[in-house]
């Protein structure tokens, strides 16, 4: 492409120049980069927004410009959205509204240009980045693996407020816009095409020439944008009765369960409904008001805090080390198969080994079903699906280990079996720099590594079930585990799309250690005569994704009993297992895996385990009155805070931030609180201490708060 003397600003850090880099080619097409060469991430800071406004004024005043192409500063990066620190810093609704107006006004300059504007999207195009693209006249998306397109703002407790909510309704229609905005969806390119967000998906290597030819075609056609026709469903919703029916249905859904605790989806729904029929400026004004209202809510502040926790965790993936290219997983059960499939789905050539041929066949079928589902949803194309399946080999034999960089066992929770397998891996030629990982959930990593020729290479990589869906990975450091092994585990977790939290080797690690008293107390409340539906509903209304009775059924009473046994042995006297666990195991009412536990196999109604519950209730003398909702929350949630404080004092977790992330991503603690300690500080640590003291007096001494919690409850001025 030949360039003529256009306007260019000197390269540098955003804010050093009054504009962004742009150039003009001989066909009169201006090429505007949203950042400077070498920038790996483009966020919309105040300085960048000012630079964009200045540059668009400059381009608009240049009579040589016939069309404009907007793109990122390099491959694999368009724009990741607004700087979240700006969202965090908004102190009033008026300040939020002013920021929304300023952002939308800047982006609107793209639409106001007299020439066609094409967005050439490759890499992340999220939040404010997509809002910018929606003001362009045509959107091309690269099919590169890095391309992600979406409006995730509701996950921060707000809505797209730079015009994105309104523009998406006008572009794609109400049903599609609601699907994206209310769920904060992030889409792959083909999904974005199907949703009507982008106009065309093109091969990555052809993005620039096709952006150029598209711009020229619009110039030659003498129009800014192509003619578009909304889908029939969207056109029908232009009629008030149809909109009313849709709105009623969605409002009812948003009033139920944890969704009712989040104001952003409800407010976004109202803005979308208005945008479907109201004049454009009125809809923009309502979007602005909504952003101002939402950005200062406690829910938004809590969700933003969790966002920063996840970003800190992802930075652990940048620690020094080599990315794993080849792995072996030993153990073809549910966890081993799930982990192997996860590895294969993220570019790692994986051999899954088990003596049970049927287990290996099931593992292949499970991964194939998952891949086929992703193809149907257009999150994966058929060629990529074949590559995933090709990366997973299954065998009853280990074969050569010479190229294996990560060896992971997910076999039965028997320390001697794990030790024998690890020793065999070393003796069979596992490379000296390879990592030996255990997925144990109840055994000590130090004990597993005992007698292994190279214990410094042994690290716990504790996935939660199901591995493909659960976002947390506990990286467990034993006394002899090297930094290199920990770094490798963290890099792997981030590559798999997970959030690693490094914990010290201790019984139950962090999540199970904190969760055990919660589940044990739920079992105690159940045996006291409280109904499962009441207990579950109380915690659902608090914001948990599922109640404790259903969670016990999902985990399985056999697993709960094993974890409880380990923790009770480690903390004798303080932790005592509920008799319900052993009784359910004896009755084979293990939960969903056995056809039902407390609840039925479908998670509803009474399961076979309720006969066990009633028998145990009858054997308990006296009893307590039916608990109130407040008492249930105090007895379940406040001990969580106390146990977390104990973990911090013992060095199981390094910081409150690590605990917060682990509780949100590991047990589903309501993220709008900003994590467990976010909740505790909002509730008041002194109030929690007083609550536990009262429970210790009136219910049982087990509630007595720890010194670790009492110290944290003392105001800083009094320490």
Task: Describe every region a protein language model picked out.
Residues 104, 109-156, 160, 334, ...:
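Glycine-rich beta-to-alpha active-site loop
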Residues 1-71, 108:
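Conserved CoA-thioester-binding segment of acyl-CoA-metabolizing enzymes
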